[in-house]
Amino acid sequence: MKQFISRCAQLVAVSHLIATLCLAAPTPVAPTPVAPIATLDREGAWVSIDGYGPNIIRITIAADRNEARTGPGYGILSEHLDNTAFKHVSSANGDSFVSAALSLHVNPAPAPHVPSAGEKYFAPQLAPVELQIKNAAGQTILTMNDWSMAPQTINGEKTYQVGATFAAPADEHYYGMGQNQESTGALDLRGRTIDCAHWYEAPAGEQVCVPFMVSSKSYGIVWDNASATRFIAGINGRTAFQSKVGERVSFFVIVADNIDAIYSGYARLTGKTPIPPKAAFGLIQSKARYDSQDALLEVAKTYQRKQYPLDVMVLDWFYWTRMGQMDINPAEFPDPDAMNKQLHDMGLKSIVSIWPRFETASRYFNELDSKGYLLKDKDGKSVDGLPFRFDRTGGLIDPTNPQARAWFWDHARDNILSHGFDYPWLDETEPDLVPDGFFYSIGSADRYHNLFPLLHVEGVANGMRVWRPEQRGLILSRAAYLGSQRTGALFWSSDINPSWEALSRQIPTGLNMTASGIAYWGNDIGGWQSLPQTSSALKAPLIDPTGASDVVGQNNDYPELFTRWFEYGTFLPTLRVHGDRKHTELWAFGPAAETILADYDKLRYRLIPYLYSSAKATFDSGAPFMRALWMDFPNDPQVSDLGTEYMFGRAFLVAPVTEQGQVQKDVYLPSGTSWTNYWTNEKYTGGKWITVAAPIQQIPLFVRDGSIVPIGSAIQSTATKQLITEIRVYPGKDGEFLLYDDDGTSMDYAHNKGTTTTLLRWNDATQSLTAVSDGRAPALAITKLIKIIK
């Protein structure tokens, strides 16, 4: 049963809270003052309204007026507050806030009533607040009919559990809310309860909380609370957010007439998604771990000898002498500067793993402890993770402390990155050591449960920008929060199992993560965890495992699994091979697998002009280019819950094979267009399921009518200038494609310098393709490049 408190009790509790807040923790940062359009009194509930442009509105509800008028929390770019688009009209029927894009109506306070028997026996309920939001067409798209503040004591702090409840029409579907790996195919969150809280050990795979929900009704809700949050999606006619800690309900509603405009609004609120260095779109080679400088270099050289494209080599953990020593073991890596120079001479980049934990015996622990730069317990002592689990030994850096962030960056730069490494990999950004029950510098870690990845990664990202201001940054990160996309990080689904089931979970997981505004997501190709002793294959493997026994042992179907996973990875925003096994390279799984893997590696590189142009579109719009089908086909009811296939850019429909021994697959082709099988050029009308052949060397892949796909020349890495060798046109509809390029490494693109764009337009009636250049480079001569697929 809900807990409720009266207005008087609320105010007493809030006053007590202000007097005693965080006795065991440092004083929280003072809130940033804001100027709402209005702050409404609803008989004990204060409601503040702020605009962030014409299609974004913030609603804040609290029992204390000052809380209701406090600025937004972490992750939100409050400088984009802009109330000028809204007109406020107050009447006996309530208060309305109207712009060209939306209207918000807050109902008037209810008439006084005689308390019920229940209200006399239990605590009186909060003053009700009800509101409705309509779109520009006057359609009601969102109704909030309840809110809650339940008093509690968390971590010694008197506070509240807060929440809001919304009507859930039967035809509404919900997406986003970060990374949840529980589904093997269903995409719609409706009917599910999502615990939006970072959790490395979630049974199906790591959970990551990005509290941004997008509705099929063409609006999004950004839930402004960093504590652990439960999202109840369309159960018993209601949708609700319930956060563990807070003094207010605060959320943003973004309204638009198309999906991409919602993501533009999200980018306005939380930051644009930068274009990564071009190397990020190539193959990233990693394993746990390369145990010497020679071993890492030999892998890079083998890629070169075999002429398999490669862009990045990764040095994973335990290259150090001790966790938190922040050094490079000279016995294994005697000259990291020379190692990185050799990689650079081969046209490659390097990534190095840097962890946020410090063993008590490491050289920096005492310094960090004395300065208060680590996560603390209620007595103010630095927390050692060793009692919780052997591999969590040490204290955790506190990224909420600006001085601790600066210290971490300075030492990561000077001790590690300065040895020629290009980019950092920030592992354990949930973090592994669950912070609940402990304290950050800004207060109870329960209050800020989901905040670590944003502040930790942003601290390093900002440091990289200052250190190398002309160079585009790149960071690998295992978790995210509101605004994490602005750090330029590439995210992945953590330490997943090397199994067919885990592979099937990746597709809906990734689609809801990109729907959460995190465009650059991937996974460990092949799974991270160690292989089981024996195979569980029920069918004869489609890949001959001969030559792979030293890697796969008796898991004879693993070369098949790795091949299918790599085929899928070819059509992910980032393609990164990783895993806790002897070898992970393309030649490690036998000659039969190697041939197919090399072909897909080369295909990925031929598609980089298409990929990179899609990345520019994401930078401009905020919308992801790995897209669930509902984004591009909102009027097709068949795709609302379809999480086994997706769009990769605007042209490709990808349907990965996720079952062992499978040689054909049922694929749904959305309505409203026709489709071409990429491999056979066979055409299909949309709006139906088909069964398509899926031999081991073919991932089911279709191209939408009207698509224009630029194909690049064969290159060994993106360090080589890539030419356009072909422009494929899939007729049947008019179409256009904005071909984009830049130097691939600098920040010039962000200032509209050093870029080239060519608008390619297909006229289906005349069967002609035209190219309009921006004039910054010689016009693309397209006549000899055009290939019409019929």
For each feature predicted by the language model, list its residue ranges.
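Boundary at the C-terminal end of the N-terminal hydrophobic targeting segment
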Residues: 22-24
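Short, well-ordered beta-strand segments enriched in hydrophobic/aromatic residues
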Residues: 47-49, 59-61, 97-104, 131, ...
